[in-house]
Amino acid sequence: MENMTQEERERGAKLLLDNPLFVEAFETLEKELLLSWARTNSNDVSQRESCWLATRLLERLKAHITSIVETGHMAKVL
């Protein structure tokens, strides 16, 4: 991504966040992870931690893409 301008990065990230397939994929993964966590035995700490970690990583990915859009927007404003 070194060759992309800030504007190109912002536009690409916004396209991802607005893409119905991308949104569906995130929502589906979040639901599947929650269901997987809910179905684990209370003493299956390893599986619960795996679900928790996957959920956090999914959130971080979305937050990173969102921050690219916000950074591009702020660069335009300033």
Give residue spans per PLM region.
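Intrinsically disordered, low-complexity segments enriched in glycine/proline and serine/threonine
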Residues: 11, 33-35, 50-52
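Short E/K-rich amphipathic alpha-helical oligomerization segments
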Residues: 27-43
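N-terminal acidic leader/helix
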Residues: 2-32, 75
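Long amphipathic alpha-helical segments
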Residues: 64-78
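Short, charge-rich amphipathic interface segments used for partner binding and complex assembly
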Residues: 38-67
